[in-house]
Amino acid sequence: MVSTYLIYFMLMSFIGYLYECLAMIIWTGKWDNRGFLYGPVIPIYGGCALAGTLFFTYVIKDFTPLSVFLIAVVFSAVVEYLVHYYLEKAFHAYWWDYSKSPLNINGRICLPASLGFGLAGLVIIYLINPYLLPVIEKIPQLLRDIISLIMVFIFTADLTLTLCVLSTFISRVENLENRINEHMDEIIGSVTDESKGINSYFYSAFDKLENSGRKYIYRPFGIFSGYARGILSRVKGFRGKSAAKLNMVLNRVKNRITR
């Protein structure tokens, strides 16, 4: 059963990714890669779907559509808020923002989205699970175990690289700020030297800054630069005391990280 639920988790994470991307096409008219990871999966969907499936299979076996809907609304809201809070505290970043949506709480959750997840819960329990789970269980046990192990390996590798990219990006931006301060000290010290023109020092210092920043920020990930750009492109923005700086660099990195 473990392999069955692992495969189910990954498939529902993929379905959640498709749902998010299609929803963005409907709302904005353009494709937008969604999710925290580089791969086409959104684990929060797979996790909630799996938790709901286990809950209504082993905890509450006699349930009604109304109870499924209400539990899905509350559970998804709690999970979405906690995940958003954790990611924001861990990386000072956010991947979705409901601040412009009605009845939102700190931009992390909103009533319309939670109601939508409630409807999704009904679709999963009554329409998807009765067909998807039996199909997975029909796969021979050995093959099912192999597939689940491959999926876990790919998922773990993606998660590890994603965490490394985000941590490296934030660290390098903070280090670059120190370099900027060093160059500003150089400029301030230089203008007191009357033997040379002030403009030449400004140009010299900022040339060094541009070369240093380009090398330090735009090419930090080697052969994984394309992978890193894909991860960073999904970050919607940063919050906190360094938000302005991080958002400025993020916008430039999205377009120039491979240059």
Identify the role of each PLM range.
Residues 1-259:
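Aromatic-rich, lipid-facing transmembrane alpha helices and their immediate juxtamembrane interface loops
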